[in-house]
Amino acid sequence: MTLDLASALNDLQTKKPLVHHITNAVTINDCANITLCIGAAPVMAEAPEEVAEMVAMAGALVLNIGTLSKSQISAMLIAGRAANDLEVPVILDPVGAGATMLRTESARRLLTELQVAVVKGNAGEIGLLAGAAGRVRGVDSAGLDGDPVAVCKSLVNAYSCTVAMSGATDIVTDGDRVVLIDNGDPRMGVVSGTGCMASSLTGAFAAGSRDQVCSTAAALAAFGLAGEKAAKRAFGPSSFKVALMDEVAALTPPVLSAGAKIRIL
């Protein structure tokens, strides 16, 4: 199996898809900007009265449960059902699933009632949703007991989706194919919003793609590669975050193809 990451980025930058976000208040601006940086267009509509109309214009729908409310959950379900009817891929970032009952039950409800194309979360979130011993502290992973690839496959089997587990090595699998991505830099974990931005990129790459393993691997490799490049010229968290967005904006298909560190199992 081979993955054509360069073509995935070229397709994105050619199509410039609209990516509809229903996301959290902490990182909404970061998500909008990183979507623009990669070459897509963001829209952050979450009023239940308009989300179905907005999804009809979009190439992908990103659902992020970082700052949940009853109204937002309702909007996610309405938008998700519309996306399923229109075959628009749905990306779920189950931020903090396992930390509180609301987050855990909401993530499971979205996975049960919607056909989610990609679930992207940290080890604790993915482990918890897969029924393994995933541990979450606030919205951050506090560890995972068990083999991470097996845990990801368990979640794939439960909900018929592609699963991406972020970490020092990112894992992407649809149950049959397993891709490991070794791009990234430790500084990505010490500024807020990078996990949410990765989910936004996953949505941007997913728009119009029929291969969610390839599109998700391309998104995470692109973001990790940008993080490596940003770390070389940043001297602190703030300059790193700015440099990270600049490096995402500077990515080209040849640069991604040359710099991606992927292993296929």
UniProtKB/Swiss-Prot annotation:
Its cofactor is Mg(2+). One of its GO terms (biological process) is thiamine biosynthetic process. It catalyses: 5-(2-hydroxyethyl)-4-methylthiazole + ATP = 4-methyl-5-(2-phosphooxyethyl)-thiazole + ADP + H(+). It holds the Pfam family HK. Substrate binds at residues 44, 193. Its EC number is 2.7.1.50. Pathway: Cofactor biosynthesis; thiamine diphosphate biosynthesis; 4-methyl-5-(2-phosphoethyl)-thiazole from 5-(2-hydroxyethyl)-4-methylthiazole: step 1/1. Belongs to the Thz kinase family. ATP binds at residues 120, 166. One of its GO terms (molecular function) is ATP binding. This is Hydroxyethylthiazole kinase. Keywords: ATP-binding, Kinase, Magnesium, Metal-binding, Nucleotide-binding, Thiamine biosynthesis, Transferase. It comes from the Archaea. It is an enzyme of class 2 (transferase). Catalyzes the phosphorylation of the hydroxyl group of 4-methyl-5-beta-hydroxyethylthiazole (THZ). The lineage of its organism: Archaea, Methanobacteriati, Methanobacteriota, Stenosarchaea group, Methanomicrobia.
